[in-house]
Amino acid sequence: MSGLGIMVLTLLLFMFMATSHQDAGEKQATQRDAINVRRRRSITRRGDEECNEHCEDRNKECCGRTNGHPRCANVCFG
């Protein structure tokens, strides 16, 4: 093989390695975002009994407390 052919193959190998490394980073970032969303949901959906009872009377969900007062809504967001 000529020197030019070896250089082309080397460049192709480097390009392949660089793109696979980027894909792994994007996948890791996506997994990290999914974990953060799960944590946020579990924190906001967990309310105390007083809040749950207060909102249950209004046929709504307890979304936590704001300034010490229960916050009720049909659907809780973040």
From Swiss-Prot:
Q: Which InterPro entries match?
A: Conotoxin (IPR004214)
Q: Which domain of life is it from?
A: Eukaryota
Q: Which residues carry the post-translational modification Phenylalanine amide, per the record?
A: 77
User: Primary place of residence?
Assistant: secreted
**Protein's cellular compartments:** Secreted
Gene Ontology MF, one = ion channel inhibitor activity
Stretch forming the signal peptide: 1-24
Q: Does the keyword Secreted apply?
A: yes
Entry keywords, A to Z: Amidation, Cleavage on pair of basic residues, Disulfide bond, Knottin, Neurotoxin, Secreted, Signal, Toxin
Which residues does the propeptide include?
A: 25-44
**UniProt note on tissues of expression:** Expressed by the venom duct.
Q: Which cystines does this chain contain?
A: 51-63, 55-72, 62-76
Q: Does the keyword Hydrolase apply?
A: no
One Pfam entry for this protein is Conotoxin
Q: What is known of its domains?
A: The presence of a 'disulfide through disulfide knot' structurally defines this protein as a knottin. The cysteine framework is VI/VII (C-C-CC-C-C).
**Similarity comment: family membership:** Belongs to the conotoxin O3 superfamily.
The identity of this protein, by name, is Conotoxin TsMSGL-13
Organism this protein belongs to? Conus tessulatus (Tessellate cone)
